[in-house]
Regions:
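Short hydrophobic segments within beta-strands
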Residues: 6, 92-94, 161
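Substrate-recognition element of Asp-dependent hydrolases with the DxDx(T/V) motif
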Residues: 64-70, 75-106, 121
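Active-site neighborhood of HAD-like aspartate-dependent phosphohydrolases
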Residues: 1-55
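Acidic, Mg2+-coordinating phosphoryl-transfer loop and its flanking beta/alpha structural elements
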Residues: 137-176
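Short amphipathic alpha-helix with an adjacent loop that forms part of the alpha/beta core around
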Residues: 133, 183-192
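Substrate-recognition "cap/lid" segment bordering the active-site pocket of phosphatases
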Residues: 94-139, 144-149
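Metal-dependent phosphoesterase signature
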Residues: 41-77
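Short acidic-hydrophobic, aromatic-tinged amphipathic segments that line or gate anion-handling sites
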Residues: 120-124, 174-183
Length: 192
């Protein structure tokens, strides 16, 4: 099976770190209380920041967040098991759009932790549905409601990995919502 996998909020717990750092940045550094909607996944949509404030946040904190992020519970074990079982694992991520240094940091983390196991990595991707279609991905795992709906609407089965306050997807037969890597593993085996 060809499995597409997002990084932030799926393999790494970086989304939780983004939430902590953005709250502190908003309250302490900017002296604001500008949260708009906590259910939004992207901090750019959660806060009422100027483009300059968003870019300053990314420049100052993104490398630190990526370096500090841990693997989601069970992610390493399940991904290695899926690889051993003959599945092809594809990283399909937006990581690297704002800062290419993040790509090298991530590659080094994979090497240092014995997770250099992916068939192919797609970095700085905005249109994940196109990559899934072009690579004939059987199922994509992502934590973004928008990405899951877009990918599913293009015909690729999708696992919506929820681990934070966010919107639900209830009306798309190509999307299943799961909450941890144990559930993902069970679901993938039930698909076969």
């Amino acid at each position: 099976m060809k499995i597409g996998i997002d990084l932030d909020g799926v393999i790494f717990d970086s989304e939780k770190l983004y939430r902590v750092y953005t709250e502190l940045y908003d309250m302490i550094e900017l002296g604001k209380n500008s949260k708009k909607d906590n259910r939004e996944l992207k901090f750019q949509d959660r806060f009422d920041w100027t483009d300059e404030e968003k870019n300053n946040f990314l420049d100052e904190y993104q490398p630190e967040i990526i370096s500090q992020a841990n693997y989601m519970p069970g992610a390493k074990m399940i991904l290695k098991k899926l690889k051993e079982e003959g599945n092809d694992l594809y990283i399909i991520t937006a990581r690297g759009i704002y800062n290419e240094q993040i790509i090298e940091i991530t590659k080094n983390i994979f090497k240092e932790t014995g997770m250099d196991i992916f068939t192919k990595c797609y970095w700085s991707i905005l249109d994940k549905a196109k990559v899934c279609k072009d690579e004939n991905i059987d199922i994509m795992i992502d934590d973004s409601k928008y990405n899951c709906e877009s990918i599913a609407n293009a015909g690729t089965k999708t696992i919506y990995m929820k681990d934070a306050p966010s919107y639900d997807i209830t009306d798309n037969p190509n999307v299943v919502t799961l909450y941890n890597w144990g559930e993902v593993y069970r679901y993938l085996h039930e698909m076969n």
